[in-house]
């Protein structure tokens, strides 16, 4: 089933894939990484002026990584704002997705956290560096194939 926004994207020749609707009726679209920045600008111009959240997850051990964006169209005199979910999948070997920092500034720390925990590199992000883990940390802790280092020195301290 295709939603109103998905139909609009098809009408204008913008490549995407509809992933259906969630339990609240919010449409989820899959966008290719190479198309994401230009489509993000189009969504902003279309009225999706608020990025509610961004998160990322590991789809499966050895599989793709996903970056998820929840967008909201906030307008005056509207009781229920229009919402949209975008999923951008990236290869595990070279997980690169264009940053949308220059479209929605609120994504700053969220993209940094996704980089820190999963190793997704957000191209053109102005400050893409670790935000939770020390800079010296090796690996990406939320990947399903991550092997945790031994922490004997911390255990011995007690």
Curated annotation (Swiss-Prot):
SUPFAM superfamilies: Nqo5-like. GO terms for cellular component: chloroplast thylakoid membrane. One of its GO terms (molecular function) is NADH dehydrogenase (ubiquinone) activity. It is a peripheral membrane protein. It comes from the Eukaryota. InterPro entries: NADH_DH_suC, NADH_quin_OxRdtase_su_C/D-like, NADH_UbQ_OxRdtase_30kDa_su, NADH_UbQ_OxRdtase_CS. It is found in: Plastid, Chloroplast thylakoid membrane. Coiled coil: none annotated. It catalyses: a plastoquinone + NADH + (n+1) H(+)(in) = a plastoquinol + NAD(+) + n H(+)(out); a plastoquinone + NADPH + (n+1) H(+)(in) = a plastoquinol + NADP(+) + n H(+)(out). One of its GO terms (biological process) is photosynthesis, light reaction. Its EC number is 7.1.1.-. Disulfide bonds: none annotated. Keywords: Chloroplast, Membrane, NAD, NADP, Plastid, Plastoquinone, Quinone, Thylakoid, Translocase, Transport. The keyword Secreted does not apply. Pfam families: Complex1_30kDa. Its main location: plastid. NDH is composed of at least 16 different subunits, 5 of which are encoded in the nucleus. Belongs to the complex I 30 kDa subunit family. NDH shuttles electrons from NAD(P)H:plastoquinone, via FMN and iron-sulfur (Fe-S) centers, to quinones in the photosynthetic chain and possibly in a chloroplast respiratory chain. The immediate electron acceptor for the enzyme in this species is believed to be plastoquinone. Couples the redox reaction to proton translocation, and thus conserves the redox energy in a proton gradient. This is NAD(P)H-quinone oxidoreductase subunit J, chloroplastic. It comes from Solanum tuberosum (Potato).
């Amino acid at each position: 089933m295709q939603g109103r926004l998905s139909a609009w994207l098809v009408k204008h020749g913008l490549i995407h894939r509809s992933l259906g609707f969630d339990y609240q009726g919010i449409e989820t679209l899959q966008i290719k990484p190479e198309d994401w920045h230009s489509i993000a600008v189009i969504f902003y111009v279309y009225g999706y002026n608020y990025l509610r959240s961004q998160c990322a997850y590991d789809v499966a051990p050895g599989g793709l990584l996903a970056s998820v964006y929840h967008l909201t169209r906030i307008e005056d005199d509207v009781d229920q704002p229009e919402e949209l979910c975008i999923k951008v999948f990236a290869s595990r070997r070279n997980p690169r997705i264009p940053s949308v920092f220059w479209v929605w500034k609120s994504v700053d720390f969220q993209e940094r956290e996704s980089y820190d925990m999963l190793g997704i590199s957000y191209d053109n992000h102005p400050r893409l560096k670790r935000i939770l883990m020390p800079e010296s940390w090796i690996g990406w802790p939320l990947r399903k194939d991550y092997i945790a280092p031994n922490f004997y020195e911390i255990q011995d301290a007690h």
